[in-house]
Amino acid sequence: MEKYLEDELPGDRVECLRQVEFEKDCWGETGMQLPCRLNKPVKPSVLDAQSLGVSLIAFRTLSSVKHTSRLCMTGRLGLKKGCLLVEEVGVCIPLFEPGDQVGQLRSTQTTSKRKAASRKGQREQRVNARLQEERRKDMAFAESIWTFMPGKKGSVVQGPNTRTLTNAHDGILDDINCAQIAGKHVGDHSNCANVIKAGVISLLGKLVQYPERPGEPFCRYYMKFGECKHMTFCKYNHPKDRFSCKTTNTIRSESLCLHDQQTTILENQFGLPSLVDKATANTTNLVASASSSMTPDEIGEGKNNPDEVFVCICGEKLLFHTNFNTTAVKELVVFALQRRNIKYCDIYVTWLIPMEYERMDELIDRAVRDNNNDLFYYVNLPPELINPYKDTWVTFLSDFSRYIIHQLLQYLNDTFGDPPSWIADISWVPDMWKTYNYSPNNNSTLWTPRYTLDLNSCSHFARNFLNHFGREVSLQAAEAAVSQNLEFLLPTIMMLMPVYSGPHHWNNDFMEILLNTNSDRSNGQIS
């Protein structure tokens, strides 16, 4: 084997040719593999240690290993030369700096075996002396700061619900006898296997002190599971005692990790109770509030409102925080989207992408099962409700028009007969009917509607309903419209009318109405 290592190892080879799947041992017992290049101690890079946040004990342990079948230097899979490949968990970490030191691991054919043996003996003496000193420091270091999180294989986390290393020797060091390790030779293969157990744990363990950021919203994932995938880069607050922080205030909007514009638009700009505040007051309404106040085992056990529905639109999940079947939301959806003689056709298969409905309990169960941090996503609300920025509306309408669902249209087609016109549809919605009959200064002589049954008037009404949203509108209707973005659905469905009842250029007329800031319902014309 020594002759094989010294004479047959190619000088220009910089990677272990052992199979990536680790089906064969690194020493090449089958005769088809070359031995691992990691047969000599390699000086670790302290810079890499700090940047990776890996414990120094991992570097000291690995730098003392002469050879092990668990580690190899590899350049495959697009990895940088000098990466450390850990077999037990399949993780690659760039620990060592490739260069002249790696090249010096190989003895040339011109070097005599006597000199090689002398160098080997001197090197082993230095390694043994350094190992004994570093192992003493490492164990003191580990006893002072290491904590172990149960239930996670190879996970070493410094967190609020963890045990100390002293109480978890069975979980971390397992079968390792520290006294025996200190007295054994570093080249002993059986000893290396035990050393690597501690090395793998320290490599993969996230020795991270999660940042405490007073004044910032609580990290929803950390509050629920006790750890955060963003570690020190997370911008939210990670209190040490996360269980004592679950008060009524923390279940409010700050626990949802939402932007200020999304959570406080109604409360700050219009003096109306925020949707998030109202929903979190009843902790069964929002997934985030429920998950913040409940353990993962309690989620999905029927403690949430089964009538709540999440709707996936344009790849994002939107929350219907009211009962879809019994509230004014049903009226806004049904009577705004009623169509005349809608028939299911292939256009919805090729042009439109279905909207996926998911019940809250099913979504939470899957999210907890998949360890998903994004239970739902709140779409950015327009900066103003009464007079929103037209760019926001037009951009959303252009995108959303490609995702109108055929399930909902089919549902309307099966439920309703043949409504006479779009005017009859909106007449069942009080707030829309108020807009339709609006007259300046309540002058009864001007109550005569300016709208007709054609598509232009329908689109014109849609724009007026959006841009002249009445201040006297009921709070329930306003919340329903905002929370479900139904203010988008009405003009979008109306824009689909050319598919059934008109020429294609009507779509352009609709966009002209939306883009025209001078359009006003009082004259019923596009100025």
From Swiss-Prot:
One GO MF term attached to the UniProt entry: zinc ion binding
Entries under InterPro entries matching the protein: Plant_ZF_CCCH, Znf_CCCH
Chain segments carrying region Disordered: 103-127
Species, as recorded: Oryza sativa subsp. japonica (Rice)
Biological classification of the source: Eukaryota, Viridiplantae, Streptophyta, Embryophyta, Tracheophyta
Zn finger intervals (C3H1-type): 213-241
Keywords for the protein's UniProt record, in alphabetical order: DNA-binding, Metal-binding, Zinc, Zinc-finger
Protein name: Putative zinc finger CCCH domain-containing protein 64
Domain of life assignment: Eukaryota
